[in-house]
Each structure stands twice: as C-alpha cells, then as structure tokens.
Amino acid sequence: MNLNKGIVVHDSFVFKGGGERLVHTLCLGLNLDLAFGAQSGQGYDLGKLPGKCIDLDVQSKLWGWRSVKRYYGFRQKTGFLKNYQTVIYSGQDAPLAVNNHPQGKNIFYCHTPPRSLYDLKEYRLSSLSTPQRLNHKAFNLFFQPLYESAIHKMDVIVANSANIQKRIKNFLRKDAIIIHPPCDTQQFHWSGQKDYYLSFARLDPLKRVDILVQAFTQMPDKRLIIASTGPELENLKKLADGKKNITFAGAVDDDQLKDLVGNAIATLYIPRDEDFGISPVESMAAGKPVLGVAEGGLLETIIPGETGILVRADPSPEDIIDAVQNLTPKRALLMRRVCEQQAANFSKDIFLEKMSALIDER
C-alpha cells in the first residue's frame, strides 16, 4: 500500500486559538492533510489549506452528549489514519485516535496536559455548582485513563515549551522534546509610538486582566487599551468604572491588532502559569517590550530588562503600577532592536524546519 505522507488530527476549529493557528501553519507549510472534530465560522478558513480536510462532526450544544460525541468521533471515526505514514495529534481529545494508527509514526504535539485533570483541577472544580462538580468528576474518572493510555502509545511527544515539558514529566511520566510554536514575525512591525499601553489577552480569569484594570484606575495619566473579548468583559467594564484612560476596543481583526501592537508603548501580559504564550513574541516582533509575569512560558520568551519587565508570579496592582512607571516610552524605545532580534528565534520558518525534520526522522 502506498501511504500518504502525513495528517494532523486536531480537536476543533470553533475559534482562532493558538493551537488552531499552529495546526493551520503546520498543514499549510508542510502540505499535510487535516482531520478535526468540529468547526465554525469563527475559526480559521480551512479552505485555503492545500491538503484534504476531514470533519469528524463531533460538535454538540449539550455538554454531556458533546463529551460522548468527541470520545466516539476520535476513537471510532478515524479508521482512515491507517492510510498515513505519520499522524500528528494536537489537543485534548485528538490523541484518542491513536488506536487507529498502530503502525507508522505517531507524534503528539502537546500544548498542555488537560489542566482540568491536573494542575488546575481544584481551581476548575471550585468555580462549578455542586451538580456540575459531580458531572465533571465523573467525566474525569472516565476520560483520564483513556487520555493517559493514548499518550503512552505515542512514538514522540513534543512540548511547546520547557514549562509544558515539565508538566508532561510530572503528570504523565513521559519525556518530551521542545519545539516552540510558530510566530508569524513578518506580520508584526514597529509603526511608531503613541500614548497607550496595550493588552490583547483573552478576557478570561486566568489571564488576570482585572489586575491591569485595577492598576490603571490608579494611574489616570496612563492610557490602557484592551483589545479582546471573553467571559470577563462585563466584569472588567464594571471594574474600570468608566475611567477615561481605559478603553475596551472589543474583538479586533488581524489588521487592527497589528496596528494597535505596532503603535503601542508596550504590551501587558500577566497570565497565570501560561503554557507558552505567543502574544509576547508578536509584541517583540513589532519592537514592543512586554510587561509580563515571572512564571510559565514567559520565562522562555522575555529577557528581563532587555525585552521587557517581569513582575512577580502573584502580582498585585501595585506591582503593575511600579512596572508601568519603569517601562517609560523612552525606555521602551531603547528595547526595540533586542525585541525584534528575540522574536526572530520563534519564527514560523524555524518551527516548520524542526517539525519537518521530526516527520522525516526514522
């Protein structure tokens, strides 16, 4: 049988996340086929990909049924994988398809082990009602052994950062190599310097944008633009209390984002133990330093004092105020060249070169 070279199996394309961007780049750059669980109009345009796209159609609006459909879809609807030499799995559910590819090469690109199963298990449970907690625990008991069994069948595990490499070792007892996610550094450019600091992290509790808002309510002479959306939007607007120096730009398109990044003084990004974090790299590609946090993937991308400032791992609004006052427009300009040089280490070309070598390796 003549086998096709390779295919990527990814959870879904229902929105434009970092994992989806990575898979899109991989399929486009290496001419790989793609299989996925679901898609929506909010995700990437898969019609531009050169290879075959296979929709497993495991989407459902009902939480419990959605979990069953995902399990069934990736376990039972991926028999076509036997036609490929190499399968790359990306996401939480996609690895369940490994049973349908017993021969050939199986590569798992791990963005993170499911955080609701491991390091953020108690955090997730604490945010749920009693019935939801019971359902969540029952699902975890069902899913965790299936997930771990699938991971142990992989030939190669790739971590997106040293941070994730440690999680894989701690929680799954497996070794992993590191290949950082791709940043399209050619898409972000220094355009100038206006009078604002920029946050474009998703408005999710783990991104801790609330701490930024609290800080800027105490700095009326400093301007903050928040260019994103998410479940915390209304809470953050209430927290901002109508302060004129804080602007909520909402969801912006790619061109608007490039313009906002390219004209900022600096960008702000303080997530809780971020897996890797591509937005600081995009900021540095535009010559803009990052006010970040000294934990997670940011320790691998930001050079303290040269491409930004890192505050302590559990920052307070006062920490942000001090950092913003230190990261003046003049100091930010002095960091431009080193920022651009550092971002080049995470380019799309380097990512594709390393992934291509891994696929071809025997």
Predicted features along the sequence, with ranges:
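Active-site donor-binding segments of glycosyltransferases and PAPS-dependent sulfotransferases
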Residues: D33-A97
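Conserved donor-binding/catalytic core segment of Leloir-type glycosyltransferases
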Residues: H189-K207, V213-D221, I225
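Membrane-proximal helix-turn-helix segments that form the acceptor-binding/catalytic region
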Residues: L125-I157, Q165
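A charged, aromatic-enriched C-terminal amphipathic alpha-helix characteristic of glycosyltransferases
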Residues: K69-Y71, P315-D319, L333-D360
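Short hydrophobic beta-strand element within catalytic cores of glycosyltransferases
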Residues: P289-G292, I302
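Nucleotide-activated donor-binding/catalytic signature segment of Leloir-type glycosyltransferases, i.e.
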Residues: E234-K258
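Aromatic "clamp/platform" in nucleotide-sugar-dependent glycosyltransferases that forms part
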Residues: R272
